Regions:
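N-terminal nucleotide-binding beta1-loop-alpha1 segment
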Residues: 1-18
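Structural beta-sheet core signal
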Residues: 5-7, 48-49, 98-99, 126-129
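Active-site glycine-centered loops adjacent to acidic/histidine catalytic or metal-binding residues
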Residues: 11, 103, 132
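Short glycine-enriched loop/turn motifs at secondary-structure junctions
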Residues: 17-19, 42, 100, 164-168
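Conserved beta-strand scaffold positions in the cores of enzyme catalytic domains, especially
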Residues: 24, 67, 126-128
Length: 173
């Protein structure tokens, strides 16, 4: 079984109001992207989708990681599409692809392994990590039908009923 991992690190992080790319901000003295790299370092192939200040972000990527440049930052789906259509990914034969944001310093290898193992065990087409929170404002919601996953709806697209859902998308697939 072959697994690839990709870190999404192309965004500007405009809400941080900083000229430094979001993934390069330190948590406990370590850039956030380093935590993400450590979390997927055991996978067979490792990629980082870079965009905003791509040279600066690429200069921090671990030696075994492959940068893929996203020229326009058009969201998560576009970043993943950029990877899948890239020459860097062309010869990748992995059966599974794990996607994580570059700004989640608390994610660990064992959590990603559990996600992959659950996908395999359940013969699922896709898996994701979600969380139940008291205040889901600003997050994509996990919409279910009879306890079965139906879709992810972003805050800006959610109706009033969907905005009451407290199960959110972590951005980890």
């Amino acid at each position: 079984m072959s697994i690839s991992g990709v870190i999404l690190a192309a965004g500007q992080g405009t809400r941080m109001k900083s000229s430094l790319p979001k993934v390069l901000h330190n948590v406990l003295g370590i850039p956030m992207i380093d935590y993400a790299q450590e979390a997927i370092s055991h996978f067979d192939s490792k990629y980082v989708v870079v965009g905003h200040q791509s040279e600066k972000v690429s200069s921090t990527i671990f030696e075994t990681f492959i940068p893929v440049v996203q020229k326009e930052q058009l969201g998560t789906a576009h970043a993943i599409s950029t990877l899948l259509e890239s020459s860097e990914f062309e010869s990748d034969n992995s059966q599974y692809l794990v996607v994580i944001p570059g700004d989640v310093p608390l994610i660990r290898k064992n959590e990603l392994d559990k996600l992959v193992n659950d996908v395999i065990k359940n013969k699922a087409a896709i898996g994701l990590i979600s969380a139940k929170v008291k205040n889901p404002f600003g997050y994509g919601r996990i919409v279910k039908n009879n306890e079965e996953f139906e879709k992810i709806i972003e805050e800006s697209d959610a109706n009033e009923t969907e905005k009451q859902i407290n199960e959110i998308n972590s951005g980890i697939y």
